[in-house]
Amino acid sequence: MKREECLLVLAGLLARVGFFSYGIYQDAHFAVKYTDIDYHVFHDAARYVAQGNSPYLRDTYRYTPLLSWMLVPNHWLQWVHFGKFIFVLFDLLAGVMVMNLLGKCGRRRKLILASLWLLNPVVITVSTRGNAESVMAFLIMWFLVHLRNRQFALSGFVYGVAIHFKIYPIIYALPISIYIRSSEGSRWFLRLLTMGIATLATLVGCGIGMYYIYGWEFLEHAYIYHFTRTDHRHNFSLWNMLLYLDSSGVVPTTINWAEFAFLPQLFICAAVTYVLWEAPTFQNMQCVLFLQTFAFVTYNKVCTSQYFIWYLLFLPSFLLDTTLSGAKGIFLIFLWVGTQAWWLYNGYLLEFEGKNMFYPRLFSACVTFFLANVYLLAQFILDCRRRNYQTNIKKTN
């Protein structure tokens, strides 16, 4: 890395140390804690692992055992916060690879775009609160770096680990296939087969290994649970009210809506890959991954702040060749932040002041946030299509 890039990474590290230190202070002095409640779940699960037991002895642990293994040093060192440093490390490494994938654009532009991850307060807050999304961010960027370098077996291996860690990256299989089909000439099928076998072998291998150690509870908690998940706390999703009423039994129904909630999002995620057919380049594939992830989070039955990390990871690459004006960009940011703030205000009144805000206030906030994100998605798709049109015009001239 060049000197300016090293300084940016250092600034990102110092910012994270600052947020981390403040978090310890807030935990000790304020009623509202800085540390994510899920981090305590990870920590407790790691204690069971350190004792030679299953992490699934901890109620609400719904993740791969690999995550609990990563936090075992918390108990060796007798310091609950050590695991946050692990997540911060993955966060910074993801930022380095984001910068790497920006390629050879102008120095100033590259630093500004990389700052959208490395100096982003949302990203920094998530990792320093002890959320594990930075591990996923690292794995996704790592497999993309290998894919760009045409290291298909390595890319497939890392991609398989990413899917094992969390299921959602499986939606990237279609744009990856389209990209390889269009960029590898007559050897495209062999390249695709190589990556596919590596991905499947890794995914199945990890699954068999975890099943051998922990049995059915691994499958039940790490995978099956997420298809019928009905969380309604801290949930920005349009499905929030329906899931709340369904889980509370207030409105009796014979239909488990949580099982069908994924159908619209899968349709949208598949549909946006059409944009890649227009210009099947690696850069455009990253834009499509951004569109897919944004759509997936928007239409997901559970949508919390940590899920925003999933698409913010691709934002620097998406904005590399954007046609959006500065004024339009500011408006979109205001729309995203404003509708989110309205939801958070109502959520605060519900959770910390005990007011019944579910209907109509919180419901209307969910609808408003959803519609705002649908509008944002439409603008992003139009932006991609304008770029593809300009690229194709240049090729014909």
Curated annotation (Swiss-Prot):
Subcellular location: Endoplasmic reticulum membrane
GO biological process: fungal-type cell wall organization; GPI anchor biosynthetic process
Record-linked InterPro entries: PIG-M
Spans traversing the lipid bilayer: 5-25, 79-99, 111-128, 156-176, 193-213, 257-277, 307-327, 330-350, 362-382
Pathway: Glycolipid biosynthesis; glycosylphosphatidylinositol-anchor biosynthesis
EC number: 2.4.1.-
A GO molecular-function annotation: alpha-1,4-mannosyltransferase activity
Family: Belongs to the PIGM family.
Function according to Swiss-Prot or TrEMBL: Mannosyltransferase involved in glycosylphosphatidylinositol-anchor biosynthesis. Transfers the first alpha-1,4-mannose to GlcN-acyl-PI during GPI precursor assembly. Required for cell wall integrity.
Protein name: GPI mannosyltransferase 1
Organism of origin: Eremothecium gossypii (strain ATCC 10895 / CBS 109.51 / FGSC 9923 / NRRL Y-1056)
Species classification: Eukaryota, Fungi, Dikarya, Ascomycota, Saccharomycotina
